[in-house]
Structures are given as structure tokens and as C-alpha cells.
UniProtKB/Swiss-Prot annotation:
Highest taxon of the lineage: Eukaryota
Annotated source species: Leptodactylus pentadactylus (Smokey jungle frog)
Name of this protein: Leptoglycin
Keywords: Amphibian defense peptide, Antibiotic, Antimicrobial, Secreted
GO BP of this protein: defense response to bacterium
Keyword Secreted among UniProt keywords: yes
UniProt entry tagged with the keyword Secreted: yes
Amino acid sequence: GLLGGLLGPLLGGGGGGGGGLL
């Protein structure tokens, strides 16, 4: 998600450096 970098790699998917499931 777009909030990956803010919420973390577990919650975001490719957002702001986050690569999680959502």
C-alpha cells in the first residue's frame, strides 16, 4: 500500500519503502 513506509513492511505493500502484504 501507499502507507507502507509509514505503517511498516508488514502492513504496507511497496509504499514509501514498505513491502508488506497489503
